[in-house]
Structures are given as C-alpha cells and as structure tokens.
C-alpha cells in the first residue's frame, strides 16, 4: 500500500 | 525531488505556457482540440483536490495552482473567448469512450477505496489518454502548426521524464507506484508515433504532417 508519500508528485 | 522529475515538471509547465501563448497571441485556437484541454482540466481538478488540505511544499502548491488556473484559462479561451476559431468539425473524438472506462477502472484498480484516492486514480488514468482527441484531430486535419507540435513534444516528454523519475525513486528511495507507472507508460507509448514525426520532420524545419 502506498503511503501519502506519493502525493508529493504533481 | 530529482532531476528527471524537475525537468519533467518544467517540460509540462512549458507545454502549458506554449499553448496559452499560442492561443492568446494568435487569438486563435485553430488546430487545438478543445476536448483534450477539457480532459486536462478534469485531470488537474480531480488530482489536486488536496491542494488546500495537504501542503507539501511551496513549489508543489504553486505548480498545482498554475496547472489548474492555466488549464481553465485554456478551456475558457477555446470555448468562449476565441470560440469562433475553434475547429469543432475536426475535434470529434468521443471523449465518453475515455471518461467512462477510466472512471470504472479507477473504482476497480486503486490503492485505497476512498473518494480522494479514487479521484486521484481516475485523474492518473484519464491523463494517460487525454491527448488522444488532440492526436486524432492532427491526424484528421493531416497536419499541425509548428507551435502546436512543440506543445505536443513538451507535453509528451514530461511523462517520459517521469518514467525516469520513477526508476530513480525505485532505485534510491524504494518508492514504487504501479498505477502511476503503467499509466505513464501508456501515455508515453501514445506519443511514440508523434515523437517519430516530430524528430524526423519538425526538427528538420518541415511542417508536421501525418498520413491522413
């Protein structure tokens, strides 16, 4: 499961 | 942040600016697919809903604001300000064939069954096919203005650079998002035909013309 870390990409 | 992602963002931003300037300066949106621009506006809206709730960095927030604002401005110019120059007869791609399958897929394949995550997933899937109406329009008209081909090149390169960014992040940050990667691959593959024509024709000073 991908954490919120991913939302740092545009 | 790594060089590939940064160059990708710059490429994406420059594509958006090129298109805005082309339409504003020439006061014409001839050859531009309003449907693709509508899809991009949907992509940014559904992807950046956490714009006000999830602060990452000044860079991240400001880029998101610029993307959303410019995509709406572009749609407004095409469908309102310069709608007399909008070439609706050649912009006939059935976008419902893009929106419905990607919406269904985002419910079936996602990382988390929550509204924000499903909308983010939908925006990722939609973005991978959002350029199809534009490419379809170029193939229908049989050619594109040089500035439009520069716009398409910058737009295509941005997600290609993001693929390298994901390789980098997998290598050095143990970061891996299969949904974004697969969609990014699809998106890049859709541009291959155009990349070939751009490199063999436009870079040699010729006009971009697709075999109709």
Swiss-Prot record, chain B:
Region annotated Important for recycling of cargo proteins with the sequence motif K-D-E-L from the Golgi to the endoplasmic reticulum, chain positions: 204-207
GO cellular component terms, semicolon-separated: cis-Golgi network; COPI-coated vesicle membrane; endoplasmic reticulum; endoplasmic reticulum membrane; endoplasmic reticulum-Golgi intermediate compartment membrane; Golgi membrane
Instruction: Give one Pfam hit by family name.
Output: ER_lumen_recept
Tell me which parts of the chain lie in the Lumenal compartment. Answer: 1-4, 53-58, 111-116, 169-178
Q: Where is this protein found?
A: Golgi apparatus membrane; Cytoplasmic vesicle, COPI-coated vesicle membrane; Endoplasmic reticulum membrane; Endoplasmic reticulum-Golgi intermediate compartment membrane
| Origin superkingdom | Eukaryota
Q: Where are the transmembrane segments?
A: 5-24, 33-52, 59-79, 93-110, 117-135, 150-168, 179-199
Residue ranges in the Cytoplasmic topological domain are 25-32, 80-92, 136-149, 200-212
Tell me where it mainly resides: Golgi
Per UniProt, the keywords (alphabetical) are: Cytoplasmic vesicle, Endoplasmic reticulum, ER-Golgi transport, Golgi apparatus, Membrane, Protein transport, Receptor, Transmembrane, Transmembrane helix, Transport
- Provide the site residues for: Interaction with the K-D-E-L motif on target proteins: 5, 117
Q: Which GO terms describe its molecular function?
A: ER retention sequence binding; KDEL sequence binding
Q: Does the keyword Protein transport apply?
A: yes
Entry membrane topology? Multi-pass membrane protein
> Entry's InterPro entries?
ER_ret_rcpt
Q: Where is this region: Interaction with the K-D-E-L motif on target proteins?
A: 47-48, 159-169
Site keyed Important for recycling of cargo proteins with the sequence motif K-D-E-L from the Golgi to the endoplasmic reticulum: positions? 193
For this chain's UniProt record, which GO biological process terms are given? protein retention in ER lumen; protein transport; retrograde vesicle-mediated transport, Golgi to endoplasmic reticulum
Family assignment? Answer: Belongs to the ERD2 family.
Main function? Receptor for the C-terminal sequence motif K-D-E-L that is present on endoplasmic reticulum resident proteins and that mediates their recycling from the Golgi back to the endoplasmic reticulum.
Entry protein name? ER lumen protein-retaining receptor 1-B
Q: What is the lineage of its organism?
A: Eukaryota, Metazoa, Chordata, Craniata, Vertebrata
Q: Which gene encodes it?
A: kdelr1-b
